[in-house]
Amino acid sequence: MSTVVVKGNVNGGVQQPRMRRRQSLRRRANRVQPVVMVTAPGQPRRRRRRRGGNRRSRRTGVPRGRGSSETFVFTKDNLVGNTQGSFTFGPSLSDCPAFKDGILKAYHEYKITSILLQFVSEASSTSSGSIAYELDPHCKVSSLQSYVNKFQITKGGAKTYQARMINGVEWHDSSEDQCRILWKGNGKSSDSAGSFRVTIKVALQNPKYDSGSEPSPSPQPTPTPTPQKHERFIAYVGIPMLTIQARENDDQIILGSLGSQRMKYIEDENQNYTKFSSEYYSQSSMQAVPMYYFNVPKGQWSVDISCEGYQPTSSTSDPNRGRSDGMIAYSNADSDYWNVGEADGVKISKLRNDNTYRQGHPELEINSCHFREGQLLERDATISFHVEAPTDGRFFLVGPAIQKTAKYNYTISYGDWTDRDMELGLITVVLDEHLEGTGSANRVRRPPREGHTYMASPHEPEGKPVGNKPRDETPIQTQERQPDQTPSDDVSDAGSVNSGGPTESLRLEFGVNSDSTYDATVDGTDWPRIPPPRHPPEPRVSGNSRTVTDFSSKADLLENWDAEHFDPGYSKEDVAAATIIAHGSIQDGRSMLEKREENVKNKTSSWKPPSLKAVSPAIAKLRSIRKSQPLEGGTLNKDATDGVSSIGSGSLTGGTLKRKATIEERLLQTLTTEQRLWYENFKKTNPPAATQWLFEYQPPPQVDRNIAEKPFQGRK
């Protein structure tokens, strides 16, 4: 058998299907090969760089609303010596248009975190004066009130305020001001002073778009109910301080100036420390009455004041700095009390004033001194009233008098004058904005503290406001404070200057600086005003220039003259207590006091001089012998035995038995024991004034003709 190989027509033979399969496999392989690719090593890194670039482009293209911080610098040029003005930081800062009209309109909220105030001096070396400046963190003050911080005109200076000092901790709306700096110079208007350079750092957040033009009005939505107006709440709390000089506690003290006082200021939920003005309401050589000013914003306010008067002193030198070394007591006169008055256009109404005091125990001893002459430890008060302020104004608070004499000095004694810090009591003033229909300011009378007693106080719930209105042009430093002559429905006038009380009842006049008081009513009201200035008294003729004149006696003088005979059976304090218990009015208390005074005066017709003491028989016999025959002959023997004398047979020789009394001694014989004690104490502090008072003193009512004819022989 042989094998046949066909080489010609392959496609036509049995090998054709196999060839087709090979061709299809070759074509399929050619189609798959182009899909397979080798990736270059650098391509993934290029792709990541492109993604990073995209992220940066997205971050810069889409704002996220974050805040920013900017710094602004502006100047106030061409200042003269007596320049004055203010910087109000916020939308009212007209001295910096870039801040006011620029970036501030592009944000909803801002806060100034730092203020650098620099004064660049341009004055000549011969110029004098300074520029005082003050920070107002709440934009409540319209004029400079504190002169503590100053720039010298010839030197210049700088002051930095941080966020906590300028109310810059919290964010503020871009439409409200944050704080204010006020300044005022005391130089000449013709002298060039320099300029201010101010640098502020501002933080901003929540940007907004401001096109500068008003948008077209949109359809008005359905009106919503008007929210109730927020009632503001303001409080002042603090202890006024005063520097005094004292030496020994049996000597008088010297008072320094009051100046500015520092107290805590609370408004709604915010609080900080602020300064307010204080000065003396009146001052004399015997006492000084302090006065404090408090700001009142525009509106109607209900004011409640709590005063706890206590005057401890403390040392100002090491090693006992700040330690208590005694106190200054209060007088027991009814002319000393806490009271309020109007200032700067405010109107006070519905005044309610309750004053109390605490007496010292007679056996209480402080620095070897006792409380046996009516000195008081404390004087407290609770005062409430309504005040209406058409614009921002002030009212003032008057405290009890600070006594300067040794009678009220309970400090440690030193050999020389030393400075002491004295507290004037705790004062709390609360202002609650009063809106109609809210029922605010419903006052409930507080009961007196344990051991305290009510006293006469200015009290007129439905009457006119207080009449004390000190003005800048009125010299209030030289006159004495007026006592209130109107008895309230709580207490009487007992113990006042005109009531014949202990030492405070004496009326003294020593020229302009006088402690005398007088009755005064103004415009039909019962409120005391500041007395008008008086001319100095004419010089007195030395020697015995006293004259005896008849005058209408008063009930108080009669009671002091003979307390046993002119006692009506009940005191003025009893009238006050009965009026309080019966809830009587002012008229009821006044009528009862007038009736009591008439009862005292009616007793003058039955008054008789005190009967003479019984005379012993021996003295009566000598008097009868002297009338019948003169004493002649005999001697007074020094060595004679007791009871043996040669009167009647001897003579008196040599010397005088009794010297002639001086005019001053005869005047002193007319004083009562209480007046003599007061005179001796007053003579230690001011001998010339004590002598003048002695020669001007008028004797009590002349109910006995013998005393009227012979005033220098004293009482029998």
UniProtKB/Swiss-Prot annotation:
Keywords annotated in UniProt: Capsid protein, Host cell junction, Host periplasm, RNA suppression of termination, Virion
Region (Disordered): 1-68, 207-228, 438-547, 630-655
Residues marked Cleavage (site): 443-444
Bias-annotated ranges (Basic residues): 18-30, 44-61
Segments of this protein annotated with the region Readthrough domain (RTD): 210-716
Organism: Potato leafroll virus (strain Potato/Scotland/strain 1/1984)
Gene Ontology MF term list: structural molecule activity
Sequence ranges of Pro residues compositional bias: 216-226
Compositionally biased region (Polar residues): 475-502
Bias (Low complexity) ranges: 1-17, 645-655
Protein name, entry field: Readthrough protein P3-RTD
GO cellular component: host cell periplasmic space; host cell plasmodesma; viral capsid
Pfam families: Luteo_coat, PLRV_ORF5
Family: Belongs to the luteoviruses readthrough protein family.
Segments of this protein annotated with the region Involved in the efficient long distance movement of the virus and the periplasmic subcellular location: 694-698
